[in-house]
Amino acid sequence: VNQGIPENRLILIESSKEFVSYLRRVHPSATVIHGNAADLEYHIESIGLRTVEHVVSGIPLVSCGEEARKIICEAVLNLLNPGGSFVQVTYFGVCPIPLKIINIYKGKRSFSGIAKWNFPPAFVWRVEKHA
């Protein structure tokens, strides 16, 4: 929203029922889905979409397990439009999006910086899907 994306174009997927309620109050024009990111493709299709332009994630990919990380990252890159981006915020200095998956989708990985305002500070990684 702060980057100029209209609130009514936001799709927010959250597993915590309490946080879903909060998001609906704070972003009343956004589509807020109570669900699991591992079911991302199902959630996106359920609202009539086939692709998305960008995904921003704060999911703790490193600690959610290798299989869940693979499922989520593949789903994101599969849903992205060509030229779209997957931004991942993490507390680890290395990109948690598996390079093998990035390469399958001919993505380009880059380090976007450190979110110093976050506590603790977080690393921001970006994968752009080949156009």
Q: Which residues does each predicted region cover?
A:
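Class I S-adenosyl-L-methionine
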Residues: 103-131
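A short SAM/SAH-binding and catalytic strip from SAM-dependent methyltransferases
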Residues: 49-68
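Conserved SAM-binding loop
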Residues: 23-24
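A short glycine-rich, Lys/Arg-flanked "PGG" loop and its adjoining helix->strand segment in the class I
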Residues: 70-82
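Conserved beta-strand signature within the Rossmann-like core of class I S-adenosyl-L-methionine
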Residues: 82-91
